[in-house]
Amino acid sequence: MSHYKSNVRDQVFNLFEVFGVDKVLGADKFSDLDADTAREMLTEIARLAEGPIAESFVEGDRNPPVFDPETHTVTLPEGFKKSMRALFDGGWDKVGLAEHLGGIPMPRALQWALIEHILGANPAAYMYAMGPGMSEIFYNNGTDEQKKWATIAAERGWGATMVLTEPDAGSDVGAGRTKAVQQPDGTWHIEGVKRFITSADSDDLFENIMHLVLARPEGAGPGTKGLSLFFVPKFHFDHETGEIGERNGVFVTNVEHKMGLKVSATCELSLGQHGIPAVGWLVGEVHNGIAQMFDVIEQARMMVGTKAIATLSTGYLNALEYAKERVQGADMTQMTDKTAPRVTITHHPDVRRSLMTQKAYAEGLRAIYLYTATFQDAEVAQAVHGVDGDLAARVNDLLLPIVKGFGSETAYAKLTESLQTLGGSGFLQDYPIEQYIRDSKIDSLYEGTTAIQAQDFFFRKIIRDKGQALAYVAGEIEQFIKNENGNGRLKTERELLATALADVQGMAASLTGYLMAAQEDAASIYKVGLGSVRFLMAVGDLLSGWLLARQAAVAIEKLDAGATGADKSFYEGKIAAASFFAKNMLPLLTSTRQIIENLDNDVMELDEAAF
């Protein structure tokens, strides 16, 4: 039996019943795709994920990649490569890719819904399969000549990496020292060592790998502004035919031993260090590396958040299945009666609390990433939200740190509830949840730690944006609060949501006040740092509560229209999750607001020796 448990029903509900993404299908850019086809695609990829892709999940963990320092190569477990080939054979690595690169255009919301299944079943499989998506980013940023190379890479299914991190330049990317030296023929020789590079070698999955490398040209200034982006292929190739040539001077020199996500080869990558120059080409022939790389980074952050959410969802569904079957103890109302019948643990109050917590967060987080994705296509944003492309881009930028930061922190935390549901059995490798937890911890670390996400959220996505995107989302929440959808049956939930919105707005005002005060007292900026992660998490809870309540309003309409059977149970679950979240999670934001409003610098003024 597969460890992975999909939830296509919830995806379809979000896409078509709540957000109305079907409005854009069958016309213009998406003329070849209708709602029925979209449903079939979701069902088909869920079947593939539960079968061939999930099959090697455990094998890849127990038998991680083997590095050969003599050949600088990585050997992957055979079962995992079989899973990858099943993914490639179905063309699933090209979902959402531009038509001129061999893909099928589709709304980003549908694309991410499809990807959720791969990430939930075997997350490393999607990471190895990111080549076509990276090819499109290279195509969009490249010169006319480089667009040809990107097309070759997509057509031939090459692998790809994003190469930023160095031993002394992690979150501080601008401290990178990898050097680029221009050659007389216009190419560049890249010299340096990079660290924590995902999929820098991948056995025989790909005939070539294109590395997108941040490096500092000789004479360039310090910090991120001095960095440029270079295309550095593993093998040289014929620029017209794509035929593979000689080895380029970029070699894997180590593979990390990790807590989880083991089958994903996390590599040290040395450039120009082994007697062969690492030849690269300046992407777009412009020195604009960090801005170009942010196209890749934003894609990666969306992926990480979706991965975390997918893992929590399957963790919850595994816990639910176990709880429905595990018989232990009597019902609490009969706990003093030693002759009372034994019941399944779903009868116990704390198990129900835990399961509903998992359900509410798993489904709330799914709603957040899909809501975010509806702003990633101008056509969808216009049809679904009535906003123009500029505002859509701003809202997407605002929400990405929520998807990544809030999603990764929350999924990891609530997966412990999934494990707890299984009791001691959850601690065993007989069940998948302990691996889910190990595999998901990385999500709050790579592609920008949660603190980085929180500061990006506050400084760039709110302050620099002058609050435009935040005001739009707050306005949407206010409109829902005032709406009477549900015939008054969500009155309490709306009142709790209104309080939560006011609490979040109060937090934003306090943090802005600390920022303004820093103009006179520089140390005041510390308070922003002390409060920003809590603020990010609070906004995530607010969005979860709102989107769950929106779902409940739709569910009430469906029940009033006579839904029966499995649909009736599904909609009743939606109302229950929204009500539970509003009553149990949203009130906690009031205390968070009080904490942020009363922040001081005591912890910053404490001597380091006292820690």
Curated annotation (Swiss-Prot):
Q: Which reaction does it catalyse?
A: a long-chain 2,3-saturated fatty acyl-CoA + oxidized [electron-transfer flavoprotein] + H(+) = a long-chain (2E)-enoyl-CoA + reduced [electron-transfer flavoprotein]; a medium-chain 2,3-saturated fatty acyl-CoA + oxidized [electron-transfer flavoprotein] + H(+) = a medium-chain (2E)-enoyl-CoA + reduced [electron-transfer flavoprotein]; a short-chain 2,3-saturated fatty acyl-CoA + oxidized [electron-transfer flavoprotein] + H(+) = a short-chain (2E)-enoyl-CoA + reduced [electron-transfer flavoprotein]; octadecanoyl-CoA + oxidized [electron-transfer flavoprotein] + H(+) = (2E)-octadecenoyl-CoA + reduced [electron-transfer flavoprotein]
One Gene Ontology biological process: fatty acid metabolic process
The keyword Oxidoreductase is assigned to this record: yes
Q: Which residues bind a 2,3-saturated acyl-CoA?
A: 171, 224-225, 301, 338, 447, 456, 460-461
The UniProt disruption phenotype note reads: Disruption of the gene does not affect the growth rate, but mutant shows decreased resistance to ethambutol and streptomycin.
Listed cofactors: FAD
UniProt keyword list = FAD, Fatty acid metabolism, Flavoprotein, Lipid metabolism, Oxidoreductase
According to the record's subunit comment, the protein's assembly and interactions are:
Homodimer.
* Role played: Acyl-CoA dehydrogenase that exhibits broad specificity for linear acyl-CoA substrates, with a preference for long-chain substrates.
Protein family membership: Belongs to the acyl-CoA dehydrogenase family.
Q: What is this protein called?
A: Broad-specificity linear acyl-CoA dehydrogenase FadE5
The organism is: Mycolicibacterium smegmatis (strain ATCC 700084 / mc(2)155)
Gene of this entry: fadE5
